[in-house]
């Protein structure tokens, strides 16, 4: 039995996906992907599945997401899902389709929040006093 493990990251959220042969069940934190709320997050999560088409019907994918907020978790899960589908099938045409549609389905967004600097640490990383010339 073929098993594939993939990881997707976004900000502080980390999603780990495990893909194996099955009946096409996709679960996020043990919940079926269809009942994930709110709907706009569900729509973003369904993009790789819709683009892949019938290929997904023979794959069971379990995704576990930790850390971050709701949108960061959605992006991390989406990346892990896309990577799992491509790696399990080994289909380069599907990989090109994902990259052409949206690069973040396969490649994690490397941007992270900037650490706050000393002295004005509660106000943000680049906070300065406003300067008056007159």
UniProtKB/Swiss-Prot annotation:
Top-level taxon of origin: Archaea
Stored Pfam families: Ribosomal_S9
Alphabetized PROSITE patterns for the sequence: RIBOSOMAL_S9
Spans annotated as Disordered: 109-134
Record GO cellular component, one term: cytosolic small ribosomal subunit
GO MF term set: RNA binding; structural constituent of ribosome
HAMAP family reported for this sequence: Ribosomal_uS9_A
Protein name: Small ribosomal subunit protein uS9
Encoding gene (name): rps9
């Amino acid at each position: 039995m073929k098993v594939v493990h993939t990881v997707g990251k976004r900000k502080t959220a980390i999603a780990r996906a495990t893909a194996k042969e099955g009946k096409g069940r996709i679960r996020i934190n043990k919940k079926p992907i269809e009942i994930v709320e709110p709907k706009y997050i569900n729509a973003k999560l369904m993009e790789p599945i819709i683009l892949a088409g019938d290929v997904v019907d023979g794959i069971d994918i379990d995704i576990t997401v930790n850390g971050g907020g709701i949108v960061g978790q959605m992006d991390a899960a989406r990346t892990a899902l896309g990577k799992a589908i491509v790696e399990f099938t080994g289909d380069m045409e599907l990989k090109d389709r994902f990259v052409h549609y949206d690069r973040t389905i396969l490649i994690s967004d490397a941007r992270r929040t900037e650490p706050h600097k000393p002295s004005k640490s509660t106000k943000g990383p680049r906070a300065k006093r406003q300067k008056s010339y007159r």
